[in-house]
């Protein structure tokens, strides 16, 4: 009698964040089904957990229209080859991790071949290009969503979706220790501390750094002991920021950090940051914040017409109200930013309300996401 085939899960991750999610999912599945086989497109973390890589994740990790066009033939070849090989393999479940432009079409191809498909991490369909929800519904058996309002959106369109909580909320403590973080960064316990996070992309650092630095200068007039920490994601962004600082605020003393964004948030009394994942991380660090964002005028004009949400930052979207001040475009200027930050640095009622609400929101999305994702995969595999 032939031996029964082990549970076979196919996965495709397209960038580092997806590799981290994939590794967590594989770990949770291996704990329950030790002989399971994992195969697909994987980064180093997924491979370390035992995923067989037919292609390296770097092949898919291209950013920007020009770069994608330059690699389009190769990307289309990889997708066609994966469709053929997964169809022959017939895995119990296929999991496309993020990378929606690549994965959702692949999921649709495999679903037509009778393979069960999951899309892990909802694209921002609730915010813009909402019609994508119909393609997602046709292509997948299940979407795994990090945030409760994402599930509510899919429910409106009868697309199967499971809210699993956010892996970042699982990884960060409910009550982080501010003094420990200050010790790591060399910040006195009794000083006022402000974190500036002007973004991870070159365009963001270019558009925001000058206004953020001028804001810090204004705040130091009110708080002469103000410590300013600036975590930058890599050497390129650091060099870019240093050039702008030399021009705008050469005498402003700041702590420049390589990475360490999370430590900077935990250590600070307030943060001024670009929108994006940083705002969610700052909420989970329980650091009161102001969101400042600026883009090229035409891009902003277009975004205003395409984006369907009332708020841009995840804390506000989760709270369903303006919990965090958002100052966009012309509003994102030093005087207004400083006025919004002053009450947060005072560590009074505004800060305490924000802190307590951040903690409640953290609890709402802290659901052991790796285990929940594994549950969804195993239920679909049956």
From Swiss-Prot:
<protein>
    <recommendedName>
        <fullName>Lipid-A-disaccharide synthase</fullName>
        <ecNumber>2.4.1.182</ecNumber>
    </recommendedName>
</protein>
<keyword id="KW-0808">Transferase</keyword>
<comment type="pathway">
    <text>Glycolipid biosynthesis; lipid IV(A) biosynthesis; lipid IV(A) from (3R)-3-hydroxytetradecanoyl-[acyl-carrier-protein] and UDP-N-acetyl-alpha-D-glucosamine: step 5/6.</text>
</comment>
<dbReference type="GO" id="GO:0016020">
    <property type="term" value="C:membrane"/>
</dbReference>
<dbReference type="GO" id="GO:0005543">
    <property type="term" value="F:phospholipid binding"/>
</dbReference>
<comment type="similarity">
    <text>Belongs to the LpxB family.</text>
</comment>
<keyword id="KW-0328">Glycosyltransferase</keyword>
<dbReference type="Pfam" id="PF02684">
    <property type="entry name" value="LpxB"/>
</dbReference>
<dbReference type="GO" id="GO:0008915">
    <property type="term" value="F:lipid-A-disaccharide synthase activity"/>
</dbReference>
<keyword id="KW-0444">Lipid biosynthesis</keyword>
<keyword id="KW-0443">Lipid metabolism</keyword>
<dbReference type="GO" id="GO:0009245">
    <property type="term" value="P:lipid A biosynthetic process"/>
</dbReference>
<dbReference type="InterPro" id="IPR003835">
    <property type="entry name" value="Glyco_trans_19"/>
</dbReference>
<comment type="function">
    <text>Condensation of UDP-2,3-diacylglucosamine and 2,3-diacylglucosamine-1-phosphate to form lipid A disaccharide, a precursor of lipid A, a phosphorylated glycolipid that anchors the lipopolysaccharide to the outer membrane of the cell.</text>
</comment>
<keyword id="KW-0441">Lipid A biosynthesis</keyword>
């Amino acid at each position: 009698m032939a031996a029964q085939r082990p549970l076979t899960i196919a996965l495709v991750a397209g960038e580092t964040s997806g590799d981290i999610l994939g590794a967590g999912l594989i770990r949770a599945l291996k704990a329950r089904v030790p002989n399971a086989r994992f195969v697909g497109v994987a980064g180093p973390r997924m491979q370390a957990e035992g995923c067989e890589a037919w292609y390296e994740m770097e092949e898919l990790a291209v950013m920007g229209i020009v770069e994608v066009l330059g690699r389009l033939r190769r990307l289309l070849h990889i997708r066609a080859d994966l469709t053929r090989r997964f169809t022959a393999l017939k895995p119990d479940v296929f999991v496309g991790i993020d990378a929606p432009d690549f994965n959702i079409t692949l999921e649709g191809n495999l679903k037509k071949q009778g393979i069960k498909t999951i899309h892990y991490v909802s694209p921002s369909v609730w915010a813009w290009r909402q019609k994508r929800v119909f393609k997602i519904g046709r292509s997948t058996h299940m979407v795994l969503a990090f945030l409760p309002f994402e599930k509510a959106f899919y429910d409106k369109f009868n697309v199967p979706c499971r809210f699993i909580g956010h892996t970042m909320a699982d990884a960060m403590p409910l009550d982080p220790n501010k003094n420990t973080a200050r010790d790591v960064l060399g910040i006195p316990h009794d000083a006022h501390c402000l974190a500036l996070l002007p973004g991870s992309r070159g365009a963001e650092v270019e558009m925001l750094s000058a206004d953020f630095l001028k804001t810090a200068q204004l705040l130091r007039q009110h708080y002469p002991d103000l410590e300013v920490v600036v975590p930058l994601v890599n050497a390129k962004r650091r060099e870019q920021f240093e050039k702008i600082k030399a021009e705008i605020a050469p005498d402003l003393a700041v702590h420049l950090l390589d990475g360490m964004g999370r430590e900077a948030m935990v250590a600070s009394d307030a943060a001024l940051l670009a929108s994006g994942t940083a705002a969610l991380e700052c909420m989970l660090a329980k650091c009161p914040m102001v969101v400042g964002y600026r883009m090229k005028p035409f891009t902003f004009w277009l975004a205003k017409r395409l984006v369907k949400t009332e708020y841009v930052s995840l804390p506000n979207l989760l709270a369903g109200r303006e919990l965090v001040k958002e100052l966009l475009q012309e509003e994102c200027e030093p005087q207004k930013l400083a006025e919004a930050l002053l009450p947060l640095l005072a560590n009074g009622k505004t800060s305490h309300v924000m802190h307590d609400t951040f903690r409640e929101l953290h609890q709402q999305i802290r659901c052991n996401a790796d285990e929940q994702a594994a549950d969804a995969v195993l239920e679909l595999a049956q």
